[in-house]
């Protein structure tokens, strides 16, 4: 069942956006970012001596400091580290150490222009227009399982869809008010994570003025449980919306949109 996404009760002045499957094709993460990380990982790991437990306690190398957060049985060799991270990627496990390392490797790719984020045009237009659409100082935040560094990189290297100039990118970060990930807010299928975000953005007393958009029904349910408004976003290539974690086919009770153009805010 599809319903028109109109506001009710308290007007919405704050929007929190999920990334993959919501403002960006889900295929970009799984078919571009993840393979890029796996491709570059061996050469990154080859820079160090193993086992890492024998290295000095402190280092200025960001990658090394991330790797040393792993258990000693994993850091005994570059092969064991590679196998560990590849397994996490293959199973799409939201591991904080993995996310931090991915962020650093993706940073190199963005800076070399080997990576550009294919944000949907309707999402670009919404991010550019919503903050100035009202005199009430509308705000936009990002909440993703990817690290905040990775989020900033992604929105700082958005592929332009309105120009014929090769490799031209748009920086949307000036339009965004903040970022949250699983290390700063918690896992996205838990209502306490959204309550924490409400506290951070000073919206605990008016949670209904906050709208969270996601393609994941469990995340939508968690946001609603925390008091926010939340809509399901359906995009081309997204997997079918299954029952929630409790086995309930309650998507018919949610507002569904197929483009951010449908938002009446």
Curated annotation (Swiss-Prot):
It catalyses: 5-methylsulfanyl-2,3-dioxopentyl phosphate + H2O = 1,2-dihydroxy-5-(methylsulfanyl)pent-1-en-3-one + phosphate. GO terms for cellular component: cytoplasm; nucleus. It is an enzyme of class 3 (hydrolase). It is found in: Cytoplasm; Nucleus. SUPFAM superfamilies: HAD-like (SSF56784). Its EC number is 3.1.3.77. Belongs to the HAD-like hydrolase superfamily. MasA/MtnC family. This is Enolase-phosphatase E1. It comes from Candida albicans (strain SC5314 / ATCC MYA-2876) (Yeast).
